[in-house]
Design a protein with these regions (language model features):
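Extracytoplasmic gate region of multi-pass secondary transporters
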Residues: 25-26, 202-245, 252-255
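Helix-breaking motifs and short loop linkers at transmembrane-helix boundaries and internal kinks
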Residues: 37, 69, 90-95, 288-289
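Helix-to-loop junctions at the C-terminal end of transmembrane segments
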Residues: 57-69, 254-266, 350
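Cytoplasmic helix-loop-helix junction between adjacent transmembrane helices
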Residues: 100-137
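Helix-loop-helix hairpin linking two adjacent transmembrane segments in secondary transporters
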Residues: 131-183
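C-terminal transmembrane helical hairpin of 12-TM major facilitator-type secondary transporters
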Residues: 268-312
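A late C-terminal transmembrane helix in Major Facilitator Superfamily
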Residues: 319-355, 362
Length: 389
């Protein structure tokens, strides 16, 4: 049991570390630009290297974890992240920063796959779903902790990368914990046996497609909602931008509450419920004429979608007997792709059909996901009846 807890702690730290790098970048764009006398837009584009690296990492994890071994990958990735964080602190040029962020994104993407693989290997049934949702809560907690460190560092005229260096220290600690931990419960280090066990069916495929569509809808909202609210209600952009703050504030609380709910509810029912709620709330957001409703609706949306990511992983792997790292990586690749390509897809749509139609598409996407979840659950029920006969 002690080893189980240590492995689970490593999986939580993986999410904590990735969030440490991803959630505070917006606060560092201007200080970073000032440090290297660079254009703000050029610096802001570095964030795409983190996201692109994470997507590449999840794709690489699909092939590497079972071949290299989960323990070796964990040690290598978090050692590399710690070294990259140090390179950001001593970076003599913006190129080194860009290289460091790419390495962090890539290794962090692999790390998220490792985290999911650990949980689905070590825990089963309802506790597995609960642990996966706790990972989302860990991500959101880091989204509060590290920006506070950034705020303290910047207000005290410290180096812009102090907060990233602190995340690097956590990565280094994770590497040492991994070195001292037995990973045999995660399937050992041999990949050949696990590779043959990777199971694929409509349920797990729908988990990946559903997460892609869910992230597409969510990040379309986060990208365009402030401009939509500004234009629709003719208010200042700064005021309209509060909708994003309200979303993330509710997401932190929602992730913690979701942990309790999932421990008492089937993951299929939980996911179907939160997607249905998201569909209804976004329908009201895009059609309401009452500005005073928006804050409450956005809080509800953030609360409902707080555990979306790992809930889809838990949902997908519930359709296979023995989930492997490839199953987890597939769903993570789908989610990363949805988040990464959402701005590009929605931008093209906005230029062709207009902002109003783009916002109307959000609840429609959720409706498609709901339909797909219902179909996959019915297929599973039919298969269980046939097996029983």
């Amino acid at each position: 049991m002690k080893n189980k807890i240590t492995l689970t702690a490593i999986s939580f730290l993986a999410n904590f570390i990735m969030a440490g790098f991803a959630t505070q970048f917006g606060m560092l764009v201007e200080p970073l630009a000032n440090t290297f006398d660079a254009n703000v837009n050029e610096v802001a584009s570095i964030f795409s290297l983190l996201n692109g690296g994470a997507l590449a990492g999840t794709i690489a994890a699909f092939f590497l974890i079972e071949k290299v071994g989960i323990k070796r990958m964990t040690v290598l990735c978090y050692g590399a992240i710690a070294a990259a964080a140090l390179s950001l602190y001593v970076a003599p040029s913006l190129f080194i920063v860009m290289l460091g962020m790419t390495v962090i994104g890539f290794c962090g993407g692999v790390g998220l796959c490792i985290a999911g693989t650990i949980v689905v290997s070590v825990w089963k049934d309802k506790i597995q779903s609960t642990m996966l949702v706790v990972q989302d809560a860990t991500f959101n907690i880091a989204g509060v902790v590290f920006p506070l460190i950034t705020t303290y560092a910047l207000t005290n005229a410290m180096n812009w990368s102090i907060s990233y260096l602190s995340v690097g220290v956590v990565a280094l600690a994770t590497m040492f914990v991994a070195l001292l931990t037995n990973f045999n419960q995660c399937g050992g280090e041999s990949g050949s046996e696990q590779e043959a066990k990777s199971e694929w069916n409509f349920g797990i495929i729908s988990g990946g497609v559903g997460l892609f569509l869910g992230m597409l809808a969510l990040y379309t909202f986060l990208t365009w909602a402030p401009m939509f609210v500004k234009e629709k209600f003719d208010i200042p952009f700064e005021q309209a931008g509060n909708i994003i703050t309200q979303y993330w504030s509710a997401a932190l609380v929602g992730a913690l509450v979701s942990t309790v709910i999932v421990s008492r509810m089937k993951i299929q029912t939980f996911l179907l419920t939160i997607i249905s709620v998201a569909m209804v709330i976004t329908s009201v957001i895009v059609t309401t004429e009452k500005l005073e409703w928006l804050s409450y609706l956005t809080y509800g949306y953030g609360f409902a979608c707080a555990a979306l990511y790992n809930a889809f992983i838990a949902y997908g792997v519930s359709f296979v007997r023995n989930a492997t790292s490839k199953n987890v990586s597939y769903i993570l690749i789908s989610g990363s792709a949805g988040a990464m390509f959402s701005p590009a897809i929605s931008s093209v749509m906005e230029s062709v059909v207009g902002l109003q139609t783009v916002m109307y598409a959000i609840p429609v996407i959720y409706a498609v996901v709901v339909a797909m979840l219902v179909v996959s659950m019915k297929i599973k029920t039919v298969e269980q009846i046939q097996t029983a006969e």
